[in-house]
Amino acid sequence: MSLDSLFEYILLTEQQASEMNRHLREVKAEIHRCQEEARNLSGRLEEAKVILETKVHLLAEKKCERLLLKKHHDVLECQKEDLLKEKEELTTILAGIKKQMAEEEEKFMKEVMEFNSNYGLTSKRDVLLREQAKAEMERLEMEAEALMNEMESLKHESFHLNTLQVQKKTINNKLAQLQNTLKDIEDKISEAIETTERLEAEKILVSQKPQSDAECLRLKKELELYSNEDFEAVYEALRMEIEFLQMKISQQSGKQ
């Protein structure tokens, strides 16, 4: 083989080395970009974790509050049922008392009128009895008013129960939003891990290429051939060139 051919091989080797260096620089830039992206994602992940932990803590508090509200709601429901039953019983009793009172009053007034008519008593006795009957009626009316106030209190408790139902719905919506946010973060982490593993594998492949590249192996065989044919000067020049190229590639790989 002539010296021109050897120089062409050397130029070709330099071109290939330049191409490999360019490819290594591209891989290095891509790895650096992915590392920056991974660091950014890690920072965002830490922030998201802090936010998530805060929201989880709040959610746990809301869950406890929800359980307490549910228990309170159940107690109020039981109390409501008891009060409704008591209200029905008191309403029935009140109606019976009013009816009995009206009957007793009518009977009493009839007896008083008959007694006064028979014995000619003064009107003062009649007035006294009427005042007593009036006082009894006022007492019963006050009891009826107390029952009505109790019924109004039950209505307010029913409104409070509706408010608790609205709070329960709001808590469930917040829980669903937190679960969706957590899923998005996990997907981004998985994507960053896959990209990093792929670039690491490509880096290893590029760093091992000089030992497995077919062109480099062919040049080594030609050098051995020239050595055997006593072309010592050419052999030494090519050997130094190849060692120089391998050293540059090794340095590039070491920097990576």
Swiss-Prot record:
Alphabetical UniProt keywords: Coiled coil, Cytoplasm
This protein's record includes keyword Nucleotidyltransferase: no
Annotated family: Belongs to the CCDC172 family.
Domain of life: Eukaryota
Gene source species: Xenopus laevis
Keyword Ribosomal protein among record annotations: no
Cross-referenced InterPro entries: CCDC172 (IPR029618)
Alphabetical list of PANTHER family matching this protein: COILED-COIL DOMAIN-CONTAINING PROTEIN 172 (PTHR22419:SF2)
Identification of the protein by name: Coiled-coil domain-containing protein 172
Localization, UniProt: Cytoplasm
Coiled coil (UniProt feature): 10-255
